Amino acid sequence: IIYTRNRAEFEEFFIAGFDPENPDNLLVIAHNGNDKRGLWSFDPKEKKFKELIYRRSDGDVFRTRFHSNRFTNSGDITAVSYYDGRELSYEWFNGEEKAIYDQLKSIIPYADRIGISSRSRDGNSLIISNRGPRDPGTYYLLKNGEFKVIGSTKPGLSSEHLANVEAITYEARDGRKIRGFITTPNSKPPYPLVVMPHGGPFIGENPGFNEWAQMLANRGFMVLQPQYRGSKYFGLDFYKTAFINGGQGGYQMQDDKDDGALYLVEKGLVDPNRMMMFGWSYGGYASLIAAARTPQIYQCVIAGASFPDPIMQVNYYRNRLNRSGGSTAAIEQLNMWLKSMSPLEQAAEVNIPILIVHGDVDQRTPPKAVRKYIKAL
């Protein structure tokens, strides 16, 4: 077993490696009854958690980082990562590996998501990767103290023409703190705005290099990527309130996106008369919901690979809750979502232009529902 989930409570448990203090135990990233995911020592024979090694109060432990030399220290966990604003930060357990990382961070231009792809047995040669908002992906060679560029994954893109990404925190209309990321064009405010919710919806945003955000910023748009309720890495409570525990059938998820746009207007960064929403998959669904909202704050929306009739998605979660003994209240929330948050049912209320993009052989979000929605407009 590498990964399990308590489906009724949405808790996660996955194996990261072996405990160096006791090889009979495992190192696992899990909730273990807590709101935030942490790194634990776990006894597989007794099926018991033994010790909490690291956990944060403001977010989940994200992943583990392994020793860069797989020849001499294969499988050794040297750090755990977590999101600190936009940055992917580390809690280090190995001083030597931290020193290497700090050195690389000081010499790599636009250092961001730094990885060591491979390292020689003697440790003197390293192939390093970097990726971030101002670097779509570059590989380097560090050999016997000499540092040089191997090449870029997107050589046609210049860092000087790419935009910065910053983390923001704003307050939703019910007082909940919502985090997000803004990509800012190299011009002066107020900017036209694209609200770009991630897909899923129950995943998290990786705020590194995003082709859509950078393309839009290059054309003068500010881009907001809101981490609305249901996004991962901010704890179970934040995750579950998307559709249970008072999630109000998805209304708050949509409010979180709109409130981010209004926050940027209030700050003088965005022109309220030039705002739109654009998303893919669940983000496309959210864009269709936005097109029928009242009061309307957007001038248009783009929906890619959307699901105008969410019955399949809702049935998936309903069946999962039924199989795992989920609460009646949670299932009722899903039923309310199906009834009140269906773009197909709201087609007559659409009050702004819509651009729909959809693959005619898409299997994950079949186009049948989109064709039905277009006829209903």
Name each model feature, range by range.
Residues I128-S129, P133, A172-I178, F202, ...:
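C-terminal substrate/ligand-recognition segments
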Residues K154-N273, W280-S281, V314-N315:
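Cap/lid segment of the alpha/beta-hydrolase catalytic domain
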Residues Y228-L377:
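Active-site-proximal cap/loop segments of hydrolase catalytic domains
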Residues S89-N186, E211-Q214, N218-R219:
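Non-catalytic accessory segments flanking enzyme active sites
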Residues T78, K148, I168, V195, ...:
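Hydrophobic/aromatic beta-strand patches that form the interior of the parallel beta-sheet core
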Residues I1-A30, R37-L39, D58-V80, Y110-S129, ...:
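Conserved beta-propeller blade repeats
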Residues I1-D19, F42-S68, D84, S89-I114, ...:
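Multi-bladed beta-propeller domains
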Residues N32-K36, D84-E87, G132-D135:
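Short glycine/acidic-enriched loop and turn motifs that connect beta-strands
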